Structure formats: C-alpha cells, structure tokens
Amino acid sequence: MAAGPTTAEKSGASGAKRSSKGSSDGPSRPGTRNRKFRMPGTRALLITLGVLLLVAGGLWALYGSTWFRVERVKTSGTSVLTPREVEAAAAVPLGAPLVTVDTDAIEARIRKELPRVDSVDVVRSWPHGIGLKVTERKPVLLIEKGGKFIEVDATGMRFATVDTAPRNVPRLVLDSASSPSLRRFDADRLLQEAVGVRGELPAEIARDTRVVRITSYDSVTLELTRGRTVFWGSGEHGAVKARVLTALLKATPKAGHFDVSAPTAPASSGS
C-alpha cells in the first residue's frame, strides 16, 4: 500500500503554489504605473502653450502696450460746477494704463475737493477714456451771513457759500438765541427740524415760500409771497400738515395767516 505525502511534501507544494502565484502578479505592477503616468501628447502641449501665449499677450496689451492708455476725461451732470473744476479735482493720471486707474481714489478726491458734489460715478470708457458722472447737491434752504448765502441741502449739510441767492430757495432764519429750546436742542438740531419741514412742502407751496423761521423745536413759521404766513408748529405730522395747508390755501385764498400746528383743527384768518 503506497504511503501518502508527508507533511513536508505538503508544505513544499503549498509554497510552490504561492511562489507561482506571486511570480505571475509581479510583472503587472510596473506596467500599471507606466500607464497611469503617461507623458502628455504633442497636442496637449500645443494647446497649453497657446493658452499661455494668449494670457501673456492680453496682459501685455493691458499693462505694457499703448493700446489701452488714458487719453481723455469726460465729465457730465454738472450744473453750477464746471467740467474743468471737476477734472482738476479728479487728477486722472493721463497716459496711465486704463486698467490700473484707481476709480475709488478719483471719487474720493472729487468729494473731498468739491463739497457741492453729492455723488460721482467714475467709469472706464474703453479703450482710452475715463467718464465722470456727477450729481450736485441742491440747496433747499439758505442761511444769510455777512452779505453772502450758505447753501444747505436736504440732509442739513452746509455745502457752499455763494454771493447771490439762488432763485426759489427760501431763506432760513434761526430766531433761537434767547429760546429755551437751545438748552435742549442746539442750532444744528433746529436746522435739521427746519430742513425736515421744508422737505414736506408741496412744490407749489415751496415755490411761494420765502422764509422758514424757527424759534424753537415746536415753533416753525413759513413766510410766503403776498405777505402770507403759516404757523407750522413742530415738524411732527408734516405730511398731514402739508395736505391741510394745501386745502386751506384753496378754501381761503384771501386769508393772510394760516395755522396748521394742530392739523386736526386748522385755522385761517386775516386778509
């Protein structure tokens, strides 16, 4: 009877199988790496080179060439100011690459040098221009001082002093020197109150208003054309007071004095 394989023979056979399996797996790994890290082809290299050349050319055109340089500045929107005044304050760097112009810095210079400017948009106008779109402040009240007139805008800002009063802009009179209101509200606070009242006036009444007189927080009087006066009171309920005053002026056109300080109980008197 033939004897079976010994333990040593079994171990040898098993080892041979593992060795054979390992040898079959070994050569495939280098091939896998070669396929994964294959060098790019000629077409890919040419495309990459073309993109780089386009980028470099674009940068040179914007920064290095004379194609896109600032050659002119155009100002629009001025009324009292002149384009030359705005452009002098802007100090746009002529000859500089258009792409490098600091538009925020230009805006800041204009606003600093010209308080009359309420806002300005600085825009690049390719290929050679800078545009300055200006919005000027408009006076709603005038403060007379030393024979000149200080212009006040709708925010209460004093922005300019002029020799001649603009047409149809009422004069502000602050009769508050001896008023107890100054203990609680300073002159600037009363100015804001007067500006608020002026802003509530309908266009037709605003055109007829010659003086806005304020004595205290709750004592604002309007002086209209033809010697008419309006006691407005405080700035509260301004829109309602404006509607009531419009109705009173139509209902009693010959009256000389109007009181809308209490808009639910308005009154008119005189002739």
From Swiss-Prot:
Q: Name one GO cellular component term.
A: plasma membrane
Compartment annotation: Cell membrane
Instruction: State where composition is biased (Low complexity).
Output: 8-24
- Ranges in the Extracellular compartment? 65-271
Q: Where is this region: Disordered?
A: 1-37
Sum up the protein's function in the record's words. Essential cell division protein.
Q: Which family does it belong to?
A: Belongs to the FtsQ/DivIB family. FtsQ subfamily.
Protein name stated in the entry? Cell division protein FtsQ
Naturally occurring in which organism (per UniProt) = Streptomyces venezuelae (strain ATCC 10712 / CBS 650.69 / DSM 40230 / JCM 4526 / NBRC 13096 / PD 04745)
| Gene name of the encoded protein | ftsQ
